[in-house]
Amino acid sequence: MKIGKFGEVNNLSIDTIRHYIDLSLIIPEKKGAHYFFDEYCQSDLELIIHYKDLGFSLNEIKELFFYKNLAKSMNYEKDIFYQSLFKLKYDKMEQEIELLEKKRDKLKGVLHDLLLTNETSNTIIGIELSVLHLLTCSKCSKKLILQDGIINNNQIIEGKLICNCGEEYMITSGIISAGKLFKANEQTLLENIISDYIHETDNAYLENMHREGEWAKKKLIHLDLNNKLILDIGSGLGFFLRSIYEELPEDCLYIAVDRDLNKLLFLKDVLARRNPKRNILFICADFLNIPIQNRSVDIVIDHSGTSNYSFEHENFLLHELNPLFKSNCYLLSLFILFKNFSSNSQITINFRANFTLSKIKKELQNLQFQSIDESTSNYLKRGGKYEDFLVQGEEIYTYSFFGKRWG
């Protein structure tokens, strides 16, 4: 029979059969351009399947076939070396089973620990009373007054901060909301968003995220973070904060700012399960309405916050936030840059300059940040469901910057 019929009878693909032919495990007769398979081919195939069921690899099966074909009629099954092939396979399988059992037991222990972790009660994360003096009105820069506060363990959980100018900042679940309150969407299940993000995002994009995130982490943890105020603009789901959380000193204040209350609630809930506890202040606000003192920020974390802002604004975000920064502050940034823009690009022409390296470097120079280290990624052609700003024909890359102003 021909190869198609032979494959159909044995429920094998033509590619698999051709592979067996290439290894000389099956040797059909060839007439012209076609192979023809007889009962000997069928017998060899059944033996291949039998040996595979015993755990032999195709190369090991080739060696067994040499015995079958070259020692025919010599009662080769009794040959000591032939038998040793089966004995070696058996011993190897025993070792693999033993190793798998050890791995299974370790995995069982990890699963047990994970279940215990899930049962751990959450610690309370609110606004520490000790940071109130740092909070000021984003409109007039005057001090804020706590009103109707619910306090637990020296942390404000609910209430509002008011200013004499009339501005109010609600405190909900330990999160300050400035300006319009971005209400939590009860139907948004962010618990599954991390796994969904991984599955829906291009591997090269994820690899770059990990590589640049590790680069930034190493820069930050080598700084003296004691008694420092860190401002993270666009904390999102907290990819960066969660990676450095345990590295933060107890007396370091980390301010996570995002427009999306859902993401802040998710991040807060995740960190509430972590030990030891760190001083994190969550603010839900537009970037231009962050209610903190001018010239109070020691370290700026801008992990694509400026780039995300630039999708909708022409002004350079770091320039807008500059009054908040100390004269000698550090900047740790990651910018999304475009190698090219397609004719149907989603980036409005007026906003494109902020996605070019020359503009970024010029703005950083204008802000008097001097480079300590920089990193530029390879080009990326795809993002994914959550990084859908790319269109066909466009390529992006990331530029990471670590620098300082010297006052």
List PLM regions with ranges.
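Basic helix-turn-helix/winged-helix DNA-binding cores
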Residues: 1-59
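Arg/Lys-rich, alpha-helical DNA-contact motif
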Residues: 40-117
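Conserved class I S-adenosyl-L-methionine
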Residues: 226-238
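Class I SAM-dependent methyltransferase SAM/SAH-binding core
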Residues: 231, 242-288
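A short acidic, Gly/Pro-enriched loop at the edge of an enzyme's catalytic core
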Residues: 288-300
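A short glycine-rich, Lys/Arg-flanked "PGG" loop and its adjoining helix->strand segment in the class I
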Residues: 315-329
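Conserved beta-strand signature within the Rossmann-like core of class I S-adenosyl-L-methionine
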Residues: 328-336
